[in-house]
Amino acid sequence: MSDSDLGEDEGLLSLTGKRKRRGNLPKESVKILRDWLYLHRYNAYPSEQEKLSLSGQTNLSVLQICNWFINARRRLLPDMLRKDGKDPNQFTISRRGGKASDVALPRGSSPSLLAVSVPAPTNMLSLSVCSMPLHSGQGEKPAAPFPQVELESPKALVTPASTLTLLTRAEAGSPTGGLFNTPPPTPPEQDKDDFSSFQLLVEVALQRAAEMELQKQQEPAPPLLHTPLPFVSENAK
């Protein structure tokens, strides 16, 4: 082995040592982070304020704390849960969404177990929530045990009186409801007759005007009437 090979090996070892030393955090800082992780092992996601507080206690940057928690949730947290007698694979640690989300939800739990607020039925639609699943034509049951929403029959939903009431409400609530209050359209045949009569009157008027104009051009101009002046004799003077 030559001296150059030895130099390269020493350089690699020195780089490896620097990398290892760069990744190691102070023991006091690690202890503070581990204590916080154990206290919040069911929801190990510190908030921004808690990250700043831990940064001041451990003299570490916020980025270092975030990276430490990412690795700790994969390596340290499963052992902590096993010591409590719980299987980490059956738990999904949820992010903190508020004070009510400090408890982890089991992975096998169904979202239908959560309380869902159902809005009050409106006057437009009527929905009935039933706990019994709907059956298909072949009698097969749906796989999902979610509560089914069944619409009422069309006869119960839409009646002539209810339709008129809905139209009246929609017309009264619309800001442009007055624009649609137009008289009913006339039948097409009546429109056609009126248009034909009007067109005939226009044609007659035009023809009459042309005849009068032609008659004026053909008639000669009337002669001018000259009244003779009275003759006065000289003897009368």
Swiss-Prot record:
| Listed name of the protein | Homeobox protein TGIF2
SUPFAM superfamilies attached to this UniProt entry: Homeodomain-like
Record PTM text? The C-terminal part is phosphorylated in response to EGF signaling by the Ras/MAPK pathway.
Assigned keywords, A-Z: DNA-binding, Homeobox, Nucleus, Phosphoprotein, Transcription, Transcription regulation
| Pfam families recorded | Homeobox_KN (PF05920)
Q: Which gene encodes it?
A: Tgif2
SMART domains for this protein:
HOX
User: Which InterPro entries did the record assign?
Assistant: HD (IPR001356), Homeodomain-like_sf (IPR009057), KN_HD (IPR008422), TALE_homeobox (IPR050224)
GO cellular component, alphabetical, reads:
centrosome; nucleoplasm
User: Any keyword ATP-binding?
Assistant: no
Where this protein primarily resides, as one coarse class?
A: nucleus
Biological process terms from the Gene Ontology for this record are: amacrine cell differentiation; negative regulation of transcription by RNA polymerase II; neuron differentiation; nodal signaling pathway; positive regulation of amacrine cell differentiation; regulation of gastrulation; retina development in camera-type eye
Instruction: Give me the ranges of the annotated region Disordered.
Output: 87-106, 171-196, 212-237
